[in-house]
């Protein structure tokens, strides 16, 4: 979504 901090893919 916005940033891949919680879910890389």
UniProtKB/Swiss-Prot annotation:
Does the entry feature the keyword Transit peptide, yes or no? no
What are the alphabetically sorted keywords of the record? Aspartyl protease, Glycoprotein, Hydrolase, Protease, Secreted
- Enzyme Commission designation: 3.4.23.-
Judged by the first EC level, this protein's enzyme class is hydrolase
Q: Which residues are glycosylated?
A: 4
What's in the GO CC field? extracellular region
* Key word Secreted present: yes
List the subcellular locations. Answer: Secreted, Extracellular space
Q: Any one Gene Ontology biological process term?
A: proteolysis
* GO molecular function term, any single one: aspartic-type endopeptidase activity
Expression sites (tissue/organ): Chorionic epithelium (trophectoderm) and placental cotyledons.
From which domain of life does this come?
A: Eukaryota
Q: What else is known?
A: On the 2D-gel the determined pI of this protein is: 5.4, its MW is: 55 kDa.
Family assignment from sequence similarity: Belongs to the peptidase A1 family.
Protein name listed in UniProt: Pregnancy-associated glycoprotein 55B
Organism the protein comes from: Bison bonasus
Specify the taxonomic lineage.
Eukaryota, Metazoa, Chordata, Craniata, Vertebrata
């Amino acid at each position: 979504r916005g940033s891949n901090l919680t879910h890389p893919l």
